[in-house]
A protein has these predicted regions:
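Short glycine-rich, Thr/Ser-proximal phosphate-binding strand/loop in the N-terminal lobe
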Residues: 3-42, 46, 121-129
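Glycine-rich phosphate-binding loops at beta-strand->alpha-helix junctions
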Residues: 70, 203-232, 243-244
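Glycine-rich phosphate-binding/hydrolytic loop that grips phosphoryl groups
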Residues: 138, 240-275
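Adenine-nucleotide phosphate-binding core of ATP-dependent small-molecule kinases
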Residues: 170-210, 244
């Protein structure tokens, strides 16, 4: 094993934990995704081990690591912390270095982040009060329909007669879905209707600039959402190679910039120590 510095980004969401390992040339050389569960620290350690093995690297070669996301303060090996808004923006701008709007559909929340042509944040909106339009919403609906979550994208693509749902609310939508089943509506048509609900919920949050990027685990596992969004917006959307990893990649990019100096960024963007 050749010794060389590597940089680690850890994004602990309420649903999934993601780790990205970059080399000094900012190339992604290792990554892993797992359920966050009820022990964020253990999830981070597990993903780190898998990521380092993929990168053919050891813990001793980690020059710096930054944590982000809901559980960022539960990562014992992190040398610094950054907010998820900063890291998602950083990760997306790495792949699309121009003025962009970012749609991030996560397990428990949705985010829209706007960056200027220099990568500076010019605005953002986040939906944290309700699970509607998130991965948790689709997970609940898949349980109601008694179908595996991973099969929803394929089913939506089979739809020939979309069934629109009248409610964004997870609780009311569950009742409405059961009623549609009772009426004899086909499952693929209902699933496509659920996808439409997710898209409408996100797009109503904020207006978007011409170059729009879609990221998040929901996008990674349900690429048909991107196709439907493009049809609704009437233009092509940008999707990074690893849409679920943008936050972790952004954190690793900050690790490259910051080095081993500890830094804890607060929610308002201020730092206890200079990054």
């Amino acid at each position: 094993m050749n010794s060389r510095p590597v940089f680690v980004g850890v994004d602990i969401g309420a649903s999934r934990t993601k780790v990205a390992v970059l080399d000094s040339a900012k190339r992604l050389i290792g990554y892993a995704v797992s359920r966050s569960g009820n022990d964020f620290g253990a999830a981070a350690e597990s993903c780190l081990a898998v990521s380092l093995a993929m990168a053919n690297a050891s813990r001793e070669e980690i020059s710096a690591s930054i944590s982000t996301g809901y559980g960022r303060r539960n990562v014992s090996f992190a040398t610094a912390e950054k907010t998820e808004i900063s890291c998602h923006g950083k990760g997306c701008f790495h792949y699309f270095p121009f003025k962009i709007s970012i749609i991030d559909i996560g397990g428990q929340d949705n985010k829209i982040i706007k960056l200027d042509g220099e990568g500076r944040r010019t605005g953002f909106k986040m939906n944290r009060k309700c699970a509607a339009g998130t991965g948790a919403f689709l997970e609940e609906m898949s349980a109601r329909l008694d179908i595996p979550l991973e099969k929803m994208d394929g089913l939506a693509r089979q739809s020939r007669n979309l069934v629109e749902l009248g409610s964004f609310c997870t609780v009311f939508s569950a009742t409405e879905v059961l009623e549609k089943i009772r009426q004899g509506k086909k499952v693929p048509d209902i699933v496509k209707g659920l996808f439409l609900s997710v898209i409408k919920r996100v797009l109503e949050m904020e207006s978007l600039t011409e170059n729009t990027v879609m990221t998040g685990g929901v996008v990674a596992h349900n690429p048909f959402l991107v196709t439907m969004s493009e049809e609704m917006l009437g233009r092509k959307l940008l999707v990074p190679e690893h849409p679920q990893l943008t936050g972790a990649i952004g954190a690793a990019l900050y690790a490259i910039e910051a080095g081993p100096t500890p830094c804890i960024e607060q929610e308002d963007g201020q730092s206890q120590k200079e990054c």
